[in-house]
Amino acid sequence: MSKRITRVLFKISGESLSTDSGNRIDEVRLSRLVAELRAVRNCDIETALVIGGGNILRGLAQQKELQINRVSADQMGMLATLINGMAVADALKADDIPCLLTSTLSCPQLADLYTPQKSEEALNQGKIVICTTGTGSPYLTTDTGAALRACELKVDILLKATMHVDGVYNKDPRSFSDAVKYDRISFKDFLAQGLGVMDASAVSLCMDSNIPIRVFSFVKHSLEQAIFDENIGTLIGEEATHVHSS
């Protein structure tokens, strides 16, 4: 990417806040996220954040386990993202980092109702905008919510931080030792191959608005690296597909 990046949106999984020992929101991991968001902000990058809720509850999994209907399960998942967002917002404020916590669901005691206009104003003021509760509608994931926010806020790039893979592969590298990683993959090739690291609906939205997506490992790399180091992860965009050479 040759374009200067001035505004980004990070999609962070809820798992990035939790530990294997069972802490749903771990102090060390939360502190790391806050420190990294500060580092990005110090680079004069306007920053929005969409965080998942998988560390607390996975709607689809809960639907099957508890035999509740899909709409209720997805709404429970949305509330889990709000809990994470509240934790991040309070941690940012405790570190004197200005932020705006938003929700697509109306809960005025907890968060501002999301609007593109209010979020745009906050970004222009140097605040980190935290977007929770996905799209506010069931059957759509936080990936799709992140893509929608990226389009509305006209970010330069959407950066998806994962905990399990370090980019886009032709098949799951955790299951197949011969999986091939892409340095770059075009929107059209990603969709044609039905790759699973990001929802097709999210990729389609970004393709329509020509917003590139970088998928990277939050275990191996920092948020700042994901913005400035073009050699990490995989870039999904308009450029031709290129397989990683080891």
UniProtKB/Swiss-Prot annotation:
Catalytic activity: UMP + ATP = UDP + ADP
Binding site for UMP: 53, 74, 135-142
Molecular function terms from GO: ATP binding; UMP kinase activity
Record text on activity regulation: Inhibited by UTP.
EC number per UniProt: 2.7.4.22
The protein's enzyme class: transferase
Subcellular location field: Cytoplasm
Keywords in alphabetical order: ATP-binding, Cytoplasm, Kinase, Nucleotide-binding, Pyrimidine biosynthesis, Transferase
Subunit field text: Homohexamer.
Sequence similarity: Belongs to the UMP kinase family.
Family matches, as PANTHER family: URIDYLATE KINASE, URIDYLATE KINASE PUMPKIN, CHLOROPLASTIC
Free-text function comment from the UniProt entry: Catalyzes the reversible phosphorylation of UMP to UDP.
Protein name: Uridylate kinase
Species assigned in the record: Chlamydia abortus (strain DSM 27085 / S26/3) (Chlamydophila abortus)
